[in-house]
A protein has these predicted regions:
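Conserved beta-sheet core of the metallophosphoesterase superfamily
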Residues: 156-242
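Short, flexible loop segments at the rims of nucleotide/cofactor-binding pockets, characterized by
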Residues: 31-35, 155-160
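A structural signal for short, well-ordered beta-strand segments and their strand-loop junctions
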Residues: 55-58, 96-102, 143, 158-159, ...
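A short C-terminal boundary segment appended to hydrolase-like catalytic domains
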Residues: 233-258
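Metallo-beta-lactamase
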Residues: 120-155
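Acidic, histidine-bearing metal-coordination/catalytic regions of metal-dependent phosphoesterases
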Residues: 1-27, 34, 257
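Core catalytic region of metal-dependent phosphoesterases/phosphodiesterases
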Residues: 6-8, 27, 32-134
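Short acidic-hydrophobic surface loop/beta-edge motif
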Residues: 15-17, 147-154, 191-193
Length: 258
């Protein structure tokens, strides 16, 4: 008689959790002709090497100096067409799937109702060009609506940004939860003082600070950082990494007759 053997019941298998991670790449604040060309080339190469599934621009791809209220003597003569053209060239080079408008593009929408027919017409034409570029790229274009504008990537909000202070990353995290933004041109990571412990990521800019005349007298301009963001995301998570493009430290020339 063979001994009776008892087989152990097989342990139930847990259902496989497939996160479906994908790569993303993003920039902010290129400001058309004010772009730092070396940093821009480095960003495009980094994008190509990383081969992201999803690319975004967080806004201020144009500078729109001619439309700036409170502008100086030279701003009003800033030609509209070269500024718009160079900004759209950058978008075509980047080929993003998501284009957010920033506060600089928002000037165009604001001047649609200008009492000056020429200004209103110029704004209308510029906006049409932006829409046409987004359509050619098959990209989603999101108009700037201040604190209400943005799109979700996993569990992080992508937005241009509205706060301009040294604690912007922390304050944005307290407003929105996990958030990736630009606007201040200064790389920063800040934790929100909330029970869910959110993180704000300021991804800097890709501008040449000495070219920005209206910021030449601000101490904070020295903190501007050329950078971009990359990382991975899935339906319910996002893992950003900010990459800083190192620049040489500016030096003052010696006195000629010293």
């Amino acid at each position: 008689v063979r001994p009776l053997t008892l087989k152990r019941a097989a342990k139930p298998k847990s259902p496989a959790i497939v996160r479906g991670w994908k790569r993303f790449f993003g920039v902010s604040c290129t400001h058309a002709r004010h772009v730092d060309r070396d940093a821009w080339r480095a960003a495009l190469k980094a994008q190509s090497d990383y081969n992201p599934h999803f690319t975004f621009h967080l806004g201020d791809f144009c500078d729109t100096g001619a439309f700036r209220s409170g502008r100086g003597e030279n701003d009003g003569s800033d030609p509209v067409d070269p500024d718009l053209t160079s900004g759209l060239v950058h978008l075509r080079e980047l080929e993003p799937q998501l284009i957010l408008c920033g506060n600089h593009e928002q000037r165009l929408w604001r001047y649609l109702s200008s009492r000056n027919d020429i200004v209103a017409y110029a704004s209308h034409q510029a906006i049409n060009c932006i829409h046409r570029c987004a359509s050619d790229l098959h990209a989603e274009l999101v108009e700037y609506t201040g604190i209400w504008s943005g799109r979700m990537l996993g569990n992080h909000l992508l937005t241009h940004g509205t706060i301009y202070n040294v604690n912007a990353a922390r304050d944005m995290a307290e407003m929105y939860g996990n958030v990736i933004f630009g606007h201040t041109h200064t790389v920063a990571i800040g934790k929100g003082r909330r029970i869910d412990n959110p993180t704000g990521y300021n991804i800097g800019a890709l501008v040449s600070a000495p070219n920005m005349d209206y910021a030449a007298n601000r101490r904070q301009t020295m903190a501007w950082t050329t950078a971009w963001v990359r990382g991975e995301y899935c339906d319910n998570d996002c893992r950003p990494e900010i990459i800083i493009h190192r620049q040489p430290t500016p030096s003052m020339p010696p006195a000629t007759h010293a």
